[in-house]
UniProtKB/Swiss-Prot annotation:
Lipidation (GPI-anchor amidated asparagine): N106
Name of the molecule in the record: Protein Bouncer
Positions of the propeptide removed during maturation: 107-131
Keyword Nucleus set for record: no
Lineage: Eukaryota, Metazoa, Chordata, Craniata, Vertebrata
Gene, per the UniProt record: bncr
Amino acid sequence: MGSLRTRQLFHAALLWLCLPLPLLLCENLHCYYSPVLEKEITFELVVTECPPNEMCFKGLGRYGNYTALSARGCMLEKDCSQVHSLRLLGTVYTMSYSCCDWPYCNRAVALEPLTAMLVAAAVVACSFCLT
């Protein structure tokens, strides 16, 4: 019984050490890309690799109080959190950008890296409990 418990703890510790390795070894950040589109238009997100010194962003275009446009991709950190005007099909939208600096962080549903790691660890730990 003790040996099985020790082995399970060892596997859990190993998992906690191995999960962050890919994040630490990657040179450039991987993000999702989509062009500036009307919010209602669905677009299959494309994975892109950002150039050095760029971060993932998610941009929203507003017309008055209505969020009408969205975009994703890479941008320089100095350009993050900025707001500017964009003219599209004769309408002027106010584009605002929010940036993040971990892989695939600009997807539609926000999921923090620590949360993802904890969920993965819980799944693995439960699989050991069932065996």
